[in-house]
């Protein structure tokens, strides 16, 4: 569908909600995506994200913090399950699969208040990129973390 000059392309995601989706928006030869509540990712997700210029990408939890944290066991299993949320590590691996020279902004978002914190998400994703099978290193990517309490800076692509 379109909103003014913006083409909005919803794509199906794996999450325990009714018809969950991510979004890719295109205008003037540029594209941005919102990819949260992923649960898991696969080639279908990669295909929808692979050449975006900016992305809001879920980095919901640190696996160890979730495992030892206050959530009841069934909730921990749901969060870590295929219809839950992406861990910091999986977010970094997904980022490795979609990195390209024209990706100008990666904003990590949807961080769990109980099972993550901004610095840990940032460093874990950066490390996954550095160790990943791609030509980029963590310091070379335009990575930031969205604040839970304040709006982020405006990003131009």
PLM region descriptions:
Residues 141-157:
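Short, basic/aromatic-enriched C-terminal tail that caps enzymatic domains
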Residues 12-14, 58, 147-149:
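Residues at the C-termini of beta-strands that transition into short coil/loop
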Residues 29, 61, 149:
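A broadly conserved detector of short glycine/acidic/proline-rich loop/turn motifs that flank catalytic sites
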Residues 1-54, 154-157:
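Core dinuclear metal-dependent hydrolase active-site scaffold
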Residues 1, 113-116, 151-153:
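Short, active-site-adjacent cap segments at secondary-structure transitions
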Residues 37, 111, 148:
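Cofactor-binding loop segments of dinucleotide-utilizing enzymes, especially the Rossmann-like FAD-
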Residues 43-145:
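Cap/insert and terminal regions of metallo-dependent hydrolase folds
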């Amino acid at each position: 569908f379109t909103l003014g000059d913006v083409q909005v392309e919803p794509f199906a995601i794996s999450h325990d909600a009714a018809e969950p989706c991510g979004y890719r928006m295109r205008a003037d030869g540029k594209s941005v995506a919102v990819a949260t509540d992923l649960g898991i990712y696969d080639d279908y997700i990669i295909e929808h994200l692979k050449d975006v210029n900016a992305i809001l990408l879920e980095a919901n939890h640190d696996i160890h913090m979730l495992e030892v944290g206050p959530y009841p066991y069934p909730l921990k299993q749901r969060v870590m399950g295929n219809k839950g949320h992406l861990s910091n590590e999986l977010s970094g691996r997904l980022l490795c699969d979609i990195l390209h020279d024209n990706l100008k902004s990666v904003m990590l978002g949807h961080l769990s208040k109980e099972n993550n914190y901004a610095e840990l998400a940032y460093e874990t994703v950066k490390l996954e990129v550095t160790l990943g099978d791609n030509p980029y290193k963590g310091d070379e990517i335009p990575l930031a973390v969205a604040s839970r309490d304040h709006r982020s800076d405006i990003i131009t692509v």
